[in-house]
Amino acid sequence: MDITLVKSLYRETEKHMDKEVKINGWVRTVRDSKNFAFVEVNDGSFFKNVQVILESSLENFKELCKMPISTSVEVEGIVQPTPNAKQPFEIKATRISIEGKSSTDYPLQKKRHTFEYLRTIAHLRPRSNAFSAVFRVRSLAAYAVHKFFQERGFVYTNTPIITGSDCEGAGEMFQLTTMDLNNIPKTEEGKIDFSKDFFGSPANLTVSGQLSAETFALAFRNVYTFGPTFRAENSNTARHASEFWMIEPEMAFAELTDYLDNAEDMVKFVINYVMENAPEEMAFFNSFVDKGLFDRLDNVVNSDFKRITYTEAVELLQKSGVKFDYEVEWGIDLQTEHERYLTEQIFKKPVFVTDYPKDIKAFYMRLNDDGKTVAAADLLVPGVGEIIGGSQREERLDVLEKRMEELNLNKEDYWWYLELRKYGETKHSGYGLGFERILMYITGMTNIRDVIPFPRTPGSAEF
């Protein structure tokens, strides 16, 4: 007999009713009495467990009643309806064999565990209800991202993980070397001699695939990347990780408004896809993680995102009369408390803030006619703050070079990026979406460490 997945039992219940099936999976709970036992089994294919009924007539009944949680089993039995129970069916076992025993000291017992504790056993936490739901949603959301862009003719491109350029110009990068740290070669000037290193020059882990993606956008028109990025920021907060995933589309012949339209459509598409394809997981989050989750997501999907300039945002915050921890004045980078006030108290929906001061944005963002601001925009959402940052890119070579000089960037490091402006340059735009940020928003999880399988944060690179 072929194996039947538990997902099939739930999605096609009538097809299996009163028929014999064979499943395999891991024991989640065992409840026994003198003549019966109830075993919940999860096979990994579905969020919910299946209840298996054991009768004392089974030859290994006593052994089965003593199974520790997480024992792997193979079950044969008849699917039968349960009209008065929470689950629509159960399996009356005719045979159960133990495939692999678990230990009685298995850490995930029936009691509820804190997310903090589960982070210490990241190799086991996917087996818990909460993280089973999180990582199923992560998989569906990743698929939805690809589906959105592929259906709109975008070309998926892979950008390098190891790079010699700093996209953000911030310098907070992880450096790579194969040199002996106890005997680092030096130049005559006493500086590190990178010519002796593996790549012959300094190399780092990428902070963004944007610059490389721009090269492909100027050949394929519309492209996107989706991969890991790394920031050596010593930010030990619930919203920052040292390794995370970024979605970065780049669009040729596109202005700032084209980016805004695309980003709004994409966010709504991904949320809708997850809501439709993970109803059980989303119901779990709405019940046990964030009781207002459905209302919040419905508001996002069904509202038109507000668009205001940075200057307008500053004026609104100053007029609010609220005493923020960080004082609001023109020229500062908006903090999370400012972003959340705009989205939660003033507009009560997602907000694009555009046209930021050039001094707080990256060198590649297009300078506006006022000479003080750039054609940049961040998407702010209720409950989280910023989840997307992007801009129209600076296509004018002379303006771009002047901007790099102002920021003391070495133009030789970006020679290939500058050269793009010489050969058929056009206006183009793009943005970056932190994948974990939108996962936090969709699931209601409040810590980035809980939406990525093995979080990497300052002082922690376990597993």
From Swiss-Prot:
GO terms for biological process: asparaginyl-tRNA aminoacylation. It is found in: Cytoplasm. It comes from the Bacteria. InterPro entries: Aa-tRNA-synt_II (IPR004364), aa-tRNA-synth_II (IPR006195), aa-tRNA-synth_II/BPL/LPL (IPR045864), Asn-tRNA-ligase (IPR004522), Asp/Asn-tRNA-synth_IIb (IPR002312), NA-bd_OB-fold (IPR012340), NA-bd_OB_tRNA (IPR004365). It catalyses: tRNA(Asn) + L-asparagine + ATP = L-asparaginyl-tRNA(Asn) + AMP + diphosphate + H(+). Its EC number is 6.1.1.22. Pfam families: tRNA-synt_2, tRNA_anti-codon. Keywords: Aminoacyl-tRNA synthetase, ATP-binding, Cytoplasm, Ligase, Nucleotide-binding, Protein biosynthesis. Gene3D superfamilies: Bira Bifunctional Protein, Domain 2, Nucleic acid-binding proteins. Transmembrane segments: none annotated. The keyword Aminoacyl-tRNA synthetase applies. GO terms for cellular component: cytoplasm. GO terms for molecular function: asparagine-tRNA ligase activity; ATP binding; catalytic activity, acting on a protein; nucleic acid binding; transferase activity. Homodimer. Belongs to the class-II aminoacyl-tRNA synthetase family. HAMAP family: Asn_tRNA_synth. PANTHER family: ASPARAGINE--TRNA LIGASE, MITOCHONDRIAL-RELATED (PTHR22594:SF34), ASPARTYL/LYSYL-TRNA SYNTHETASE (PTHR22594). This is Asparagine--tRNA ligase.
